[in-house]
């Protein structure tokens, strides 16, 4: 075959393949039209299939139009209603573990923040652990000196409850060295206190956006709860202190809606001292159990009504629950006055159950070690010493720290009452241990209908870390 014949043959074959391809495409179109015309209303040219995927960072709506996908990013749907939170507390027979973050153990080899003052608060959909970071990581040189309470590096951040305070899952909330946070059913509200001691400012964030501020009115370390604030029917309440930690200070209740302050009221408490209140909703009011850092080894009690009227006094029970404290047998109890001369103190909590009260305290009378919760019959209203239940959470061979309260809303549990819960901070490092840093992890417990065995859910990290040996 000469070259011309080869060219003609190749051209003929190519032309034949092109014609065959055109025929196949025509047949494909005819078959598709015939099939679609026989499917009735099941599929039509104007029909679409829409699928929505609720991802962590966005909601995707994927529209499938036969063999074509159109991806559209849409806004995350917001909750429509405020939480009620006017129900009574559920009766608790014991407290079961809800979560434990093991942050310090994980932080020996993971990217975990140096923190203090962790606390838990819940929305209708989830509970989150909030914490004050030191702007540094465990086992890193910047963790040196983090025993200090107030610095420009401290921030309020949060993770889903049970997660360690790690850099990959933490969400920024506010610049703060003192804070509170709560959810009204629609959005999170946070209050972060920062700035110099004499001119500190509290910034109120709502839905992640700063919307209001509170300036220091006494010029002496404006500070707040270090635990969950309380929202009832869309109004959120919290307590702040401004003034000395070891003598008479000034105390105020604040009320906000959608992050904007709509009311405040001074608390008249001459001779008494209020710090770091642990508050919860109960029967339409806010009940708080606080810290007396001046003289009392009994805890201040504050009950707030929606109109910002209040009653204030001390937990009546004849058993002291602050630290340091004296012997139980030597304590008489008072509903109106501070008792004891120990000074100092530690953040704590309690829950009213009718006239009875559940109260938490360190097991040690002199240091922040061990933790137990007691139920005292008639302890809310009388100087009762009648301990009807006790549960150990951390044994006295291990460090504890702050503790505080929160509740599980009925929207989350589908119960007709608010489940009482608490958290216990377990402080590690300075000043009790030979490290360059101070941080903490936490255990979280919630009320159940059964008694729960004693155990020790302690921190468990083996110290010192590598950074402490350099």
From Swiss-Prot:
List localization entries: Virion membrane; Host apical cell membrane
Task: Please provide the record's keywords in A-Z order.
Answer: Calcium, Disulfide bond, Glycoprotein, Glycosidase, Host cell membrane, Host membrane, Hydrolase, Membrane, Metal-binding, Signal-anchor, Transmembrane, Transmembrane helix, Virion
Q: Which cofactor does it need?
A: Ca(2+)
Which parts of the chain span the membrane according to its record?
Answer: 15-35
Q: Which cysteines are joined by disulfide bonds?
A: 90-417, 122-127, 182-229, 231-236, 277-290, 279-288, 316-335, 421-446
Residues on Virion surface side: 36-470
Specify where the region named Hypervariable stalk region lies, as residue ranges. Answer: 32-86
Q: Which SUPFAM superfamilies match?
A: Sialidases
Catalytically driven reaction(s): Hydrolysis of alpha-(2->3)-, alpha-(2->6)-, alpha-(2->8)- glycosidic linkages of terminal sialic acid residues in oligosaccharides, glycoproteins, glycolipids, colominic acid and synthetic substrates
Q: Which Pfam families match?
A: Neur
Q: Where does Ca(2+) bind?
A: 292, 296, 322
| Topological domain ranges for the Intravirion compartment | 1-14
- Region (Involved in apical transport and lipid raft association) residue spans: 11-32
PTM info: N-glycosylated.
Residues annotated as binding substrate are 116, 150, 275-276, 291, 368
Q: What is its EC number?
A: 3.2.1.18
What is known about regulation of its activity? Inhibited by the neuraminidase inhibitors zanamivir (Relenza) and oseltamivir (Tamiflu). These drugs interfere with the release of progeny virus from infected cells and are effective against all influenza strains. Resistance to neuraminidase inhibitors is quite rare.
GO MF term list: exo-alpha-sialidase activity; metal ion binding
GO cellular component terms, alphabetically, are: host cell plasma membrane; membrane; virion membrane
Major place of residence: virion
**Which residues does the annotated region (Head of neuraminidase) include?**
89-470
Note the HAMAP family from the entry: INFV_NRAM (MF_04071)
What miscellaneous comment appears in this entry? The influenza A genome consist of 8 RNA segments. Genetic variation of hemagglutinin and/or neuraminidase genes results in the emergence of new influenza strains. The mechanism of variation can be the result of point mutations or the result of genetic reassortment between segments of two different strains.
Chain's role: Catalyzes the removal of terminal sialic acid residues from viral and cellular glycoconjugates. Cleaves off the terminal sialic acids on the glycosylated HA during virus budding to facilitate virus release. Additionally helps virus spread through the circulation by further removing sialic acids from the cell surface. These cleavages prevent self-aggregation and ensure the efficient spread of the progeny virus from cell to cell. Otherwise, infection would be limited to one round of replication.
**Stated family:** Belongs to the glycosyl hydrolase 34 family.
Protein name per its UniProtKB record: Neuraminidase
Which gene name belongs to this protein? NA
